[in-house]
Amino acid sequence: MKKFLLCLFWVTFLLSPCLLQAQEDAARSLDALQKKYSGLKDYTVDVNVHFDVEGFKAPDMQAKLYCKPPDRMKIESKRIFFLPKEGGTFNPFMFNKEDFEVRFLERLTYDGRNAVKLKLTPKKRKLNAQDFILTVDTDRHLIREMNTSSFDGREVKASIEYGHFGDFDLPTRIELHLDVQFSESMEIRDFGPSAQPPKGVTGRVDITYSNYSVNSGLSDQIFNKTDSSNLRGGS
C-alpha cells in the first residue's frame, strides 16, 4: 500500500507541471485570438443560409449582417430570416478568458496544422448559460470548430472555413449541426408574411458569407432598432 501511495505521489508530482503548462497554453490561445482581431472595428457581409433540417422546408435565405465588436449586431432582410444564434455569427470577442473557466483537453492536428481543444465553462451560471468546446488552430489563431451545449440538452456543432479580407481572416462558410429548440435558438427577422418556425429541429445548416466590407466606419445608429436609415458613418 505504501508503495502504491508513493507511486501515486510521484505520478501526481511529475504530471502537475505538465498540467499547469497546458492550462497556461489554453489561456494564451484565447489571448492570441483576442489580439488577432483587436483591430477589427466593424464589418458588413452578405449572408446566405441553406437549411437541411428535419421537418423544416424553406428556400435559401439571404440577408445583410452588420457587426460592430464586441457585441453589436444587426440583420437586414427583405423576407423572413432565421439565423442560429449558436454558431451562426462570428464573434471572436465572446471568449474572454476572464469570463470562463478554461480547461485544456488535448493537442491535435487540424487540416495539417497544430491545434488545441479547449473547454470553456462560464464563471457566472445563468439560465441560458452554455459550455463551449473550441478547436483552435494555434498556427493561425483561428477557431475551426465550436461545440456548444446548454443545461437543457441543446447542442450545436459549428465547423468554420475562412478567407482573408482586409487584414483579417473572416468566415466564408459555417456548417452547423443542430439538435436544438428552433424558436429559442434563432434570430428571427420578419419582413414579409408572418410565419412560425418549428419548435425543435435536428439537422444541418450551411451559412455562407460574401462581399465583406471591413472597418468601413459603421455608425452606431444602424444598431438602433427605431432608426436604420443611416447605414454608415465616418469615412
Task: Spell out what each predicted region is.
Residues C18-N48, D52-E54, G233-S235:
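N-terminal leader/targeting segments and the immediate start of mature chains
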Residues D52-D111:
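An acidic-aromatic
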Residues K36-Y43, F56, D111-R113, D139, ...:
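Edge/loop elements at the starts and ends of beta-strands within beta-rich repeat scaffolds
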Residues A26-R28, M94-F104, R154-K157, R204-I207:
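A short, amphipathic edge element
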Residues C7-P17:
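Bacterial N-terminal signal peptides
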Residues A32, A63-K68, A158-G166:
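Extended lipid/amphipathic-ligand handling interfaces
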Residues M1-C7:
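Positively charged n-region of N-terminal signal peptides that target proteins for export
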Residues N114-N224:
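Gly/Pro-enriched, hydrophobic low-complexity segments
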